[in-house]
Amino acid sequence: YIECTGTFDYVDPPINCWYKNGHGSLDIRTAIEQSCNYFFNMIGFQLGKVGDNEFSEVQSLNKLQEYASLIGLDRKTGIELSEATPKVSDAKAVPSYMGQGNNLFTTSELARYATVMATSGNVFKLTLLDKVMDPKGEVIQEYEPEIEDVVNISSNIWDVIHDGMRRVIQTHSQFDGLGVEVA
C-alpha cells in the first residue's frame, strides 16, 4: 500500500495529486481506479532508488523505457500508413510515471497499448485491413491478427490491472448510459 497525502514531496518541485486532500492508503487496484498521481509518482521514485534513499533519475527513466518496450510502446505498430516514431519519456522521471513526461505516441500506438492490457499481454502488429478483393469480389489477400510479442507476467498481475481498469468504468459516472457493456 502507498499512502497518498495529496502532495508528492520526494522531488523538487513537489507534485500535487489531482485530489489535493489525498486518497489515503491505496493498493494498485484503487490507484488505477482513482488515477492517483501520488501513487504512480511513488512507483517511479521507488524504481529509481539506488542504495538506501538516493534517487537516480537515469535509473528511473531506464526502468520506464524497459517496461514501455515490453508492451510495444517504443516501436511503430505496423499499420499500412506512415507513422511517427514513438518516444518514451527521457526526462522528468517521476512525473513521467503518471503520464506527464515528454512521451510522444500516435493514436494507433496507444490503441495497441490498450490492446496489450485488454488481452493480458499480446502485442499485435496492427493492420487496418481485413482483406483485399478484386473488382469481381474475389478475395486476393486476407489479413489475420499477428502477435508480434507477448508480455509474460503472472496472470495474477493481469487480474489486478483488469480489476483496476474495470473499477474506473464502474465507479465513475462518465461511462453511465452508453448502452453497451464497457468492461
Residue ranges and their predicted role:
Residues 1-183:
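Beta-lactam-recognizing serine transpeptidase/beta-lactamase-like catalytic domain environment
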